[in-house]
Structure formats: C-alpha cells, structure tokens
A protein has these predicted regions:
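C-terminal coupling/interaction segments
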Residues: 2-5, 271-316
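ABC transporter nucleotide-binding domain
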Residues: 183-271
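ABC transporter nucleotide-binding domains
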Residues: 13-16, 23-217, 223
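A structural detector for beta-sheet-dominated domains
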Residues: 19, 39, 242-244, 269-271, ...
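Primarily ABC-family ATPase nucleotide-binding module
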Residues: 3-14
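Short, flexible helix/strand-to-coil boundary loops that buttress conserved ligand/catalytic motifs
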Residues: 83, 234, 307
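Structural motif
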Residues: 94, 254-257, 287
Length: 316
C-alpha cells in the first residue's frame, strides 16, 4: 500500500480545512458548524474543557465517525480513506498489541502505512533509541510500564513520516521527564515540516509549543488564531507585587479583578483597560514595594475569560 501523493502548500499556508462541520447525538450538538484552517508546518492546539467536542472533531477528521454536515479538505483534496493515510493519529484511548515485541510492533505498524519492511525495521530501531528504549526492543509490550507503552505508541504515530499528526492528550499520565522528552520530539518533528494538531487540556504545555490555537466550548469554536494574535485580542493583564513585611492586600483594590497568593508575592489580575502603572499609588499605601512586575495574560487566563464571555453571550 502506498500513500497518495499530495500537492502540499508552502509552509504557513493552509493544509487542513474544515468547513461547517457538525455532529449531533440526539439533542446534544457535539460539533457546531466548525470552521478551521490549519497552517502547514505548525503546531495547532485544540483546547477546551472535558466534553467540549475536541475528540469528536478529531474523530470526524479521522473518519472514525461521520459528520452530519460540512466538508474537510487535506491539501485542497477532499479527505477520503486514502488521503487520511497521510495523517498519523495518537488517540486518547491507547491501544497496542500487548503480546508483540516492541521492535516487531513498530515495524508492523509502519508496514501497514506502506513503509517497506527493511526501512520499517530501521526506523523502528531509530525511534526506540531516540526514546531511550533500545534495550527493550525485544521485550513484549505488556512487560513495559504504562509510560513506556505510551512512548511506543508515540513512535508508532510518527514512524510512517506522515504529513500531519494528531496527538490527543499525548502527555496524559506521563511524569515531567517524559513530558519534556516528548515535547522536545514534537518540536523536532515540527522542524522537519510536520503539521501537528495538539489536543489537550494542559494549557501550560500548549502555551510552550503551540503556534496557533482554537478553543472549543460546547462543540463550538469560540476562539482561534495565532497564539500571539489571541494574546493581543485579550489585553487581560496581571501584575506580581510584594512589599516589605509581606502585608496582604485587600480584596477590593480598585482596578483589580482578583488576587492570588504565590510564595511571598501576590498576583493581581487587572480589569480590562487598567494600566498597571495606575495601581502604584494604591499599592504603595501598604509599604515599600520590593516587587512590581507586569505580566502578559497566560493561556489559562485567556481560556477562562473566553469561556466566561461565551457563556455570557459576548463574542471573543
């Protein structure tokens, strides 16, 4: 089996297009007229709370479930079973042949995607080495820890060198060292030109690696675009402050939405339109400042504000 040859756009131009994609289960609308354009060579974050519709949208892209309406195109071509083979997919529900040896497992899965056997075996060896699992190559999958099995499935997703990869909660259950290892590998694959859809609820990780994001709430895209533009559209700011003697600021400071204690300092989230410098006179009432630092909004703050606006019926 060979993958179809795609007429790929230049890096940065749209490789995957979703137009008015919808899916309902009875009265529940899992995807509501989803429209997306994902740039080639980017890491594109699918973000949203549990049950928001991220996995449903991914399963529609992978043709695991069929949409009720809308269309999907990959590199300008309708997404079919054949063109879908140009997409690697790591689902949230992991699945490996537990009685197969690690090397045999990866080799077999690469062959299923059209990689010749000799090349498939070489790629499998390289991936096992990259993941620090070379000494486990001849061990059965069921003898590996859960985290090690997850790394095997990660390798299986990339081993056929697909044009696009979809990772659904790839870091779930991993320790910090393995999260860092896979994060670095995701960035390496991006550097090779691979387009990566990164579906997660771990906003701090998305903030580290995503070039662009979409935020899904109730099956609907409520926010999307390059991460820097999204930040610019949400001027929500915070300042980190500390005083000599570590006093506690009052909860009703003018221009402050909420406060949060962090070690010996306080993080103050500002109301929209408030200039951090405007706070200084009120803050200095509590004593000499030892720290005053303005911060850009975090992805978590943007997420919370966007969801709150959507639920109030205010466009983001």
């Amino acid at each position: 089996m060979t993958r179809p040859t795609l007429d790929l756009p230049p890096v940065g131009e749209t490789i995957l297009t979703l137009e008015s994609v919808s899916k309902s289960y009875g009265s529940v609308r899992a995807a509501r007229d989803v429209n997306l354009e994902i740039p080639r060579g980017s890491i594109y974050g699918f973000l949203g709370p549990n049950g928001a519709g991220k996995t449903t949208t991914i399963r529609i892209i992978m043709k695991i479930i069929m949409a009720d309406g809308g269309s999907i195109r990959l590199a300008g071509r309708p997404l079919t079973g054949a063109t879908r083979d140009s997409i690697g997919y790591l689902p949230e529900e992991r699945g490996l042949y537990r009685k197969m040896k690690c090397l045999d497992q990866l080799t077999y899965l690469a062959e299923l995607k059209g990689v010749p056997r000799a090349e498939a075996k070489q790629r499998s060896d390289r991936w096992l080495t990259r993941l620090g699992l070379a000494e486990w190559r001849d061990r059965k999958v069921d003898s590996l820890s859960k985290g090690m099995q997850q790394k095997i499935q990660f390798a299986a997703t990339f081993i056929s060198e697909p044009e696009m990869v979809i990772l659904d909660e790839v870091f779930s259950g991993l320790d910090p060292l393995n999260i860092e290892l896979l994060r670095d590998m995701i960035l390496e694959e991006k550097a090779k030109g691979t387009t990566i859809i990164f579906s997660t609820h771990m906003l701090a990780e998305a903030e580290k690696i995503c070039d662009a994001i979409c935020l899904i709430e109730g099956g609907e895209i409520i926010l999307d675009g390059p991460l820097e533009k999204v930040r610019a559209d949400f001027p929500l700011q915070s300042v980190r402050v500390a005083w000599e003697g570590n006093p506690e600021p009052p909860a009703d400071l003018p221009g402050v939405l909420h406060r949060e204690k962090s070690d010996s300092s306080w993080r103050l989230t500002l109301a929209e339109g408030v200039n951090p410098r405007e706070l200084l006179p009120d803050l200095m009432v509590f004593g000499p400042l030892t720290l005053f630092s303005a911060n850009r909004p975090s992805l978590s703050e943007i997420f919370l504000e966007a969801v709150a606006r959507h639920r109030r019926g205010v466009p983001s």
